[in-house]
């Protein structure tokens, strides 16, 4: 969890750092700013190096040792089943935690998508322009403006603050013996953080919001799989954990597919889309 958030922290800070040392964070329409391009290049390089290092250093359990450790007998290995049967027999925790996961990951998908526009409009007073598409006029933020690009850099700082909050909260979670209580408390704090963004118009006050969101993020990365593995018995743990990853992917697909439709419902004619409502 620490390394995950440490990597996030570095990635979020790259655009801000590059802009601070003089690399342009402004570009013409349809062109990606240099500060963002260099951030992606460095991120890709770090990812490749980490994958190579992990592949070279991490060794798998020998099958015999894995079977002995998990109490898997030769007879149980012969038992064949499919994913649908496993889902029917899944423990209650698989479904209850899965439902919670659905709404958590949908919320974070909206955050990653709409935070930039929210901060640009509500905090940095980004100017708006009117565009015409297929004969329909729309009021949108001027993405080429200095305010919008500055807001984008600041969002990187906010996400870095979220990562710091997540690391700090991750050290507190083990002190709470009841895992369900720790999970609930973390998500409530994260929810308060999301709601508070609607009322905050100061760039530094948003630090508090994203620290609270970091509490939810820490719990989402650690507790669901812990709760699930403790509820599992038998030799299908790997399959169940793989299926459980669907509670991460599916909600993001749904949120990405429906987000624009929901935002349009909030948008009044002649007004810029209130992306803060999505948070």
Predicted regions: what they are:
Residues 1, 219-233:
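Intracellular juxtamembrane helix-capping segments at the cytosolic ends
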Residues 1-3, 232-244:
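Loop-to-transmembrane helix entry/capping segments in MFS-fold secondary transporters
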Residues 2-23, 245-256:
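Glycine-rich segments within core transmembrane alpha-helices of 12-TM secondary carriers
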Residues 20-45, 261-279:
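A membrane-interface helix-boundary motif in multi-pass transporters
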Residues 34-35, 125-163, 278:
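Loop-to-transmembrane helix entry
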Residues 44-64:
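C-terminal membrane-cytosol helix-exit motif in multi-pass small-molecule transporters
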Residues 61-99:
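Juxtamembrane intracellular "pre-TM" segments in multi-pass secondary transporters
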Residues 189-201:
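C-terminal ends and interior cores of transmembrane alpha-helices
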């Amino acid at each position: 969890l620490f390394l995950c958030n440490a990597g996030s922290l570095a990635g979020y800070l790259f655009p801000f750092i590059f802009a601070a040392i003089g690399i342009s964070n402004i570009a013409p329409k349809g062109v990606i700013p240099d500060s963002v391009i260099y951030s992606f290049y460095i991120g890709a390089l770090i990812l490749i190096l980490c994958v190579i290092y992990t592949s070279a250093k991490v060794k798998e359990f020998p099958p015999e040792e894995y079977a002995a450790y998990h109490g898997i007998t030769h007879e149980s290995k012969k038992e064949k089943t499919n994913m649908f049967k496993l889902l029917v027999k899944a423990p209650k925790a698989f479904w209850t935690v899965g439902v919670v996961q659905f709404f958590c990951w949908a919320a974070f998908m909206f955050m990653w998508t709409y935070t930039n526009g929210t901060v640009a409009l509500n905090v940095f007073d980004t100017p708006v322009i009117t565009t015409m598409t297929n004969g329909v006029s729309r009021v949108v933020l001027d993405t080429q403006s200095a305010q919008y690009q500055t807001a984008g850099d600041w969002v990187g700082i906010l996400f870095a603050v979220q990562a710091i909050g997540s690391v700090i909260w991750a050290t507190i979670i083990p002190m709470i013996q009841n895992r369900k209580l720790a999970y609930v408390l973390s998500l409530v704090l994260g929810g308060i953080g999301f709601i508070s963004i609607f009322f905050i118009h100061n760039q530094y006050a948003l630090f508090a919001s994203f620290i609270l969101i970091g509490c939810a993020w820490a719990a989402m990365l650690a507790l669901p799989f812990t709760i699930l593995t403790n509820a599992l018995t038998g030799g299908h743990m790997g399959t169940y954990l793989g299926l459980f990853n669907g509670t991460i992917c599916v909600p993001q697909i749904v949120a990405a597919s429906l987000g624009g439709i929901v935002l349009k419902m909030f948008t009044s004619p002649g007004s810029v889309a209130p992306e803060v409502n999505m948070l």
